[in-house]
């Protein structure tokens, strides 16, 4: 089982959860705003992602995370489930948040983009759903986080672990601060809690 795309996709016993799949009408509206302002929109399915266009902002976003560039498919959301959107913008946050903030949650996790999921979804909600589906109420919970999208999750779990490269707010919520993600921080954190030898 796993949770991905900020809690929007939960896979358990080969089935996906009832979370996710941003409404196509909202994806279309966001795509229109991005096109009008020189921004871009990326659509995330399970292991696949596509972009509405390719421009310098898209290049900068994916270069920041050393991630392959998405293929361009402006209408991908019409024929595939989309669990997370990435609004690729530097200065236009309010143009997206104001009209759609009651339906979508926006997390700015890089200088170039905002992770975008359905309102009410989060990694925290995903953890709660998976625990309930698996009948594991009461088990100790651990989570690693570094960005704004991780804050609700870090507040929820029993043992919050912040990455060394994380934002101050994540570190403030952490029981333990591990090394950076590029310095085996996950392994170090698991070893600290005796979850790995």
What are the functions of these language-model segments?
Residues 7, 89-93, 164-168:
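Short, polar loop motifs at secondary-structure junctions
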